[in-house]
């Protein structure tokens, strides 16, 4: 697992813990302890990339949450939500790659261009 992927996962688990998902603690602890052992110097650029990953995950979560709860959404609203999620996920991948580039801990992740772009 690349550092960008580990940080991405920690941001998701942190959100789950904040909303009471007790089952997320074990993986969160494992990943945060493993990251701590890397002794990575935190630069402003790295901090910024981490925050952008967390914000992208936050936005994806917010958009998908109404759908998960079964709220009434017409086809146009679902389409709009899916496009927004795709766009935020694209930004998320870019920032995970930036984390890997800055730390030299990981690999560049490539995503296939969606035909709607």
Predicted regions and their residues:
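Anionic, Ser/Thr-rich low-complexity intrinsically disordered regions
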Residues: 1-117
């Amino acid at each position: 697992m690349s550092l960008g992927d580990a940080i991405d996962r920690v941001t998701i688990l942190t959100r789950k813990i904040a909303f009471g998902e007790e089952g997320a603690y074990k993986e969160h602890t494992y990943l945060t302890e493993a990251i701590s052992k890397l002794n990575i110097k935190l630069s402003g650029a790295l901090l910024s990339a981490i925050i952008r990953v967390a914000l992208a995950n936050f936005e994806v979560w917010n958009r998908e949450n109404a759908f998960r709860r079964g709220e009434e959404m017409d086809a146009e609203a679902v389409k709009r939500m899916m496009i927004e999620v795709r766009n935020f996920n694209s930004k998320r991948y870019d920032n995970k790659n930036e984390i890997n580039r800055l730390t030299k801990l990981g690999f560049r992740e490539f995503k296939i261009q969606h035909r709607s772009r």
